[in-house]
Regions:
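C-terminal extensions of enzymes
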Residues: 83-122
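Shared catalytic-loop signature of beta/alpha-barrel
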Residues: 1-94
Length: 122
């Protein structure tokens, strides 16, 4: 999996890929992923997120002219279902984007308490 916009650009320049698979968690966030998507669109190449974390990539894919598929890994989906209240879930091959504000993800504060890390000298 690639994370650098410049590597994706090289792939596009050489016509090496038919589909790009950026991921907001590995590409430097939403803005960087949008830049990669724009590069891909200029070459008429679709985007299908790769590497999982569907809950973080769903809105990006839905909002892109060349956005295509969202990759769902069962383990990462289970993590999202633990950390967020009522996250979007696939229904067959369809996932509906939440109409809630932002990413549509409400943190499960009770579950997050179990992940809290305190400084050693606290």
């Amino acid at each position: 999996m690639e994370g650098s916009r410049w590597r994706f650009r090289s792939f596009l320049d050489y016509g090496s890929l038919d589909i790009l698979q950026p991921n907001v968690c590995y590409n430097g966030g939403y803005t960087e992923t949008l830049k990669i998507a724009s590069l891909a669109q200029s070459h008429n190449i679709p985007i299908a997120n790769g590497g999982g974390w569907p809950l973080h990539n769903l809105h990006t894919m839905a909002g892109l002219m060349n956005g295509w598929r969202v990759e769902f890994h069962l383990g990462m989906q289970a993590t999202g279902e633990l950390l967020f209240k009522d996250p979007p879930k696939p229904d067959g091959n369809i996932v509906r984007v939440s109409k809630k504000p932002g990413l549509g993800l409400e943190p499960n504060v009770d579950a997050l308490k179990d992940t809290l890390m305190l400084p050693r000298n606290a």
